[in-house]
Swiss-Prot record:
GO terms for cellular component: membrane. Heme binds at C447. This is Trans-cinnamate 4-monooxygenase. It comes from Pisum sativum. It is an enzyme of class 1 (oxidoreductase). Keywords: Heme, Iron, Membrane, Metal-binding, Monooxygenase, Oxidoreductase, Transmembrane, Transmembrane helix. It is found in: Membrane. The keyword Transmembrane applies. It catalyses: (E)-cinnamate + reduced [NADPH--hemoprotein reductase] + O2 = (E)-4-coumarate + oxidized [NADPH--hemoprotein reductase] + H2O + H(+). GO terms for molecular function: heme binding; iron ion binding; trans-cinnamate 4-monooxygenase activity. The chain crosses the membrane at residues 3-23. The gene is CYP73A9. (E)-cinnamate binds at R213, S214, R215, L216, A217, Q218, A306. Pathway: Phenylpropanoid metabolism; trans-4-coumarate biosynthesis; trans-4-coumarate from trans-cinnamate: step 1/1.
Length: 505
């Protein structure tokens, strides 16, 4: 370290210490701040709580302190919400005040500092992006237009598993085939494109880049440099890799999908409105000057992550729980056989006639919530919450997993028991009508993908259970359902091998 850098570092440490001491002295005077561990100069609470701020660790902190707690990470304030009443305040009652988004140093790179829809600040740009994305993605018309494609993709999964001789004996990692299915479902909607197999070179390249993006973004290992600016130089290599991955992904989206669709559109003498795919609507908005080239690519970026990955995680969790709870799997199969008739493959219109299947989906989303802390919220200005002062630009984490797994709010929440949604919790829906259960959030910044995710989950899990007896591999009574958490993700740690024995109809 040269002398100039050393001087700058020491000066930064001194100023940070003075700032931290000054702020800590403000606690309880002009500001009534939420409770939490006492911060130390420069590092705040980072030395006490570390980098791994997953839903379970934050639950433990809430039990120690309060349903609203404040963590100071040097320059960042993290407010953790752990009660339905406070969640309602953040997401609904004060939805405008807390409707913005905070980003960290890595998400700044992957979203172009909020040029997407998920991580943009609340305001005119967000409203414009939401409007542009709603028509091609998030309406019942889209569901009805594409449901036959979803059913076809699910049927292809069933056929491929039946053809795989290993599936019924030693088992297969079915997630790999389901991943192809999810890409085909969403790329049909986005680009009217699909991949023929898991070996398709473009699919392999796309999957690898998306996987690397997720690994880099969801890791906790860069938190120290995000929380503590004086440590940020140590992230230089990490952030360089993030930028390289971001550039390669956006170039791939542009070269192989967006530009290809532009060429296709320009060669058509007459354009059939009924055949428009999502990117056509988005490119129309670009031509009108509503969004720019970068916005188009960041919308594609969001769909690759927010739609494909989260739904895939939930499908994988649902299958794992059914493998480990054979009595529930059998009960679900019996319902479909009774209501639809043996051999009649479940379709999107059938889902409303299958309450136990719906309950299985709800219970999967409750116990194994894909986004357990929701996407972080932020207040642009000083605000009040639960009788406390919340400083401007605080990162608000709603621990939705704990709201749905708190034994004070749910009967035996640690159990996978779909019956709860047919009995004591029969009124609870996934759309946020009960603030104990928020798998998609609620309010202005809720996940609009709920309208796609629920039928895709129902069709996929329904067809697998209809056509196969899903079992652990030989020598195991259950499969491993250990969790792997991320910045705000929750997926299964090990992609387990599943035995799929075809049923005879």
């Amino acid at each position: 370290m040269d002398l100039l850098l050393l001087e700058k570092t020491l000066l930064a440490l001194f100023l940070a210490a003075i700032t931290a001491i000054t702020i800590s002295k403000l606690r309880g005077k002009p500001f009534k701040l939420p409770p939490g561990p006492f911060p130390v100069p420069v590092f705040g609470n980072w030395l006490q709580v570390g980098d791994d701020l997953n839903h379970r660790n934050l639950t433990d902190l809430a039990k120690r302190f309060a349903e609203i707690l404040l963590l100071r990470m040097e320059q960042r304030n993290l407010v953790v919400i752990s009660s339905p009443e406070l969640a309602k305040e953040v997401l609904h009652t004060q939805g405008v005040e807390f409707g913005s988004r905070t980003r960290n140093v890595v998400f700044d790179i992957f979203t172009g500092k909020g040029q997407d829809i998920v991580f943009t600040v609340y305001g005119e740009h967000w409203r414009k992006m939401r409007r542009i994305m709603t028509v091609p993605f998030f309406t019942n018309k889209v569901v009805q237009q594409y449901r036959f494609g979803w059913e076809s993709e699910a049927a292809s999964v069933v056929d491929d598993v039946k053809k795989n001789s290993k599936a019924s004996v030693n088992g297969i990692v079915i997630r790999r085939r389901l991943q192809l299915m999810m890409y085909n479902i969403m790329y049909r909607i986005m680009f009217d494109r699909r991949f023929e197999s898991e070996e398709d070179p473009l699919f392999v390249k796309l999957k690898a880049l998306n996987g690397e993006r997720s690994r880099l973004a969801q890791s906790f290992e860069y938190n120290y440099g995000d929380f503590i600016p004086i440590l940020r130089p140590f992230l230089k290599g990490y952030l360089k890799v993030c930028k390289e991955v971001k550039d390669r992904r956006l170039q791939l989206f542009k070269d192989y999908f967006v530009d290809e669709r532009k060429k296709l559109g320009s060669t058509k003498s007459t354009y059939n409105e009924g055949l428009k795919c999502a990117i056509d609507h988005i490119l129309d908005a670009q031509k009108k000057g509503e969004i720019n080239d970068d916005n188009v690519l960041y919308i594609v970026e969001n769909i690759n992550v927010a739609a494909i990955e989260t739904t895939l995680w939930s499908i994988e969790w649902g299958i794992a729980e059914l493998v480990n709870h054979q009595e529930i799997q059998n009960k679900l199969r019996e319902e479909m056989d009774k209501v639809l008739g043996p051999g009649h493959q479940v379709t999107e219109p059938d889902l409303e006639k299958l309450p136990y299947l719906q309950a299985v989906i709800k219970e999967t989303l409750r116990l194994r919530m894909a986004i357990p802390l929701l996407v972080p919220h932020m207040n642009l200005h000083d605000a009040k919450l639960g009788g406390f002062d919340i400083p401007a630009e605080s990162k608000i984490l709603v621990n939705a997993w704990w709201l749905a797994n708190n034994p004070a709010l749910w009967k035996k929440p640690e159990e996978f028991r779909p019956e709860r949604f047919l009995e004591e919790e029969a009124h609870v829906e996934a759309n946020g009508n009960d603030f104990r259960y928020l798998p998609f959030g609620v309010g202005r910044r809720s996940c609009p993908g709920i309208i796609l995710a629920l039928p895709i989950l129902g069709i996929t899990i329904g067809r697998l259970v209809q056509n196969f007896e899903l079992l652990p591999p030989p020598g195991q009574s259950k499969i491993d359902t250990s969790e792997k958490g991320g910045q705000f993700s929750l997926h299964i740690l090990k992609h387990s091998t599943i035995v799929a024995k075809p049923r005879a109809f």
